[in-house]
Amino acid sequence: MTALDLSSTVGVVGTGTMGQGIAQVALVAGHPVRLYDTVPGRAGEAAAAIGARLDRLVEKDRMTAAARDAARARLVPAGELAEFADCTLVVEAVLERLEAKQELFRALEDIVGEDCLLATNTSSLSVTAIGGALRSASRLVGLHFFNPAPLLPLVEVVSGFATDVTSATRAYETARSWGKTPVACADTPGFIVNRIARPFYAEAFAVHEAQAADPATIDAVLRECGGFRMGAFELTDLIGQDVNESVTHSVWQAFFQDVRFAPSLAQRRLVESGRLGRKSGHGWYDYTDDAEPVEPHTAEPADRPAYVVAEGGLGPAADVLAMIREAGIQVREEDEDHGTRLVLPSGGQLVLADGQTSVEFRDVVYFDLALDYRRATRIALSAGHDTLPQTLSEAIGLFQALGKQVSVIGDVPGMIVARTVARVIDLAHDAVAKGVATEEDIDTAMRLGVNYPLGPFEWSRRLGRDFAYDLLDDLHLRDPSGRYAPSLALYRHAYATEKREGAS
């Protein structure tokens, strides 16, 4: 099944930010577009707003004046739904209320032709549930655009339980013909992005709730060490704490309160206090005019160690050994492999985050996972109460000698980046095993939908088969709530190459 012909009329119901954005996308692609809103006059106002945005595209040389004029001529505000009778595709972008969407599509069934494709832009409701009220849900598909729709390339094409392959394929190809990057997924809570992205927020909030680090430090580590474009606290302030918490709560409830998706009490308190982020002037951060910028915790300069002893290859942090040598610090290598660790002159150990805690060992400092140790500008370290001050000082001095800012956080297993990435990888493997989407589509969705530096499977391949599983298994031993229990899919992935002779 091919994409809709450009002569096909596209109807958009709902004229808020998303409705206008979707209408603009279809319009610029070349379709005639009809806009409808239940509030009289709103469709005309939305058409004028879209026209103004087209003017700005002309001013920026992204559109010719002739193309703008032609697009304006194709955009028609509708006074009633009956004017959608000749539409070949209708996309709804109304309030996220199941009853409202069901009522709308029931009305559309009596208006449009049998070959008209119906699409919902829902981000949190079940496509299957929406279609449950229709006489024939086979032509209903989810088309989840990301805001702002004209700018962001990703579209999740969601098949409900009754959606037929022809409808899903037609929606997919149409989105692609509009210049978007579609990904196909099953109707699951959160679809791809809002399902797999939950740990990015949840683990940052958990580290904060454990009093291990403040929001500014956690955000800085996620950006400068993890390679994420924004930290979890600043991003949720931008999204709106109420909006982000609502999505988290919706996914958690849809998964029957699965602890892996549990909301954050700290975020709940923030919402209850009215601190919703940028839009209210205060969230995790203060956005009032006279507010002072909050700086991350950064360690004072410390002396570099004269040497380190390498025991093992440091696994995903192998580049650190080369960087130490390049910094002029002697590396002594031991033949016996005791794991991925460095021994400092104090006798203390420097170990890559592995889901254990410093307090379990005599004299250990953990360092966090980095997307790219060479490009990272900040590294997080954690130490227990029994860690010698000299050991911590040497660890700080070592990474400072490599050109890194150092943030010392509390002794939490898995630290910040490592536990976040491990959980994202786990949810991604679980989603594939349950038929939600392919590995390729999940990687694409996470890179384009939430700007991750790598897709979960790309990250998994870089870290090695067992990194995420082993870290989460260690975390699960220390927090047996089930939050960190590795999925069966991740277990299979981690040990796919290890075979036993038989059952005992």
PLM regions: where:
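N-terminal Rossmann-fold NAD(P) dinucleotide-binding loop
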Residues: G19-Q20
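Conserved acidic E/D residue at the C-terminus of a beta-strand in Rossmann-like folds
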Residues: L35-T38
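Rossmann-fold NAD(P)-binding glycine/threonine-rich loop
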Residues: E103-L154, S159-E173, R341-L392
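Rossmann-like NAD(P)-binding element
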Residues: R42-E45, R56-L118, L125, I329-S358
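NAD(P)-dependent Rossmann-like dehydrogenase/reductase catalytic/cofactor-binding core
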Residues: T2-L4, A29-H31, K180-V183, D187, ...
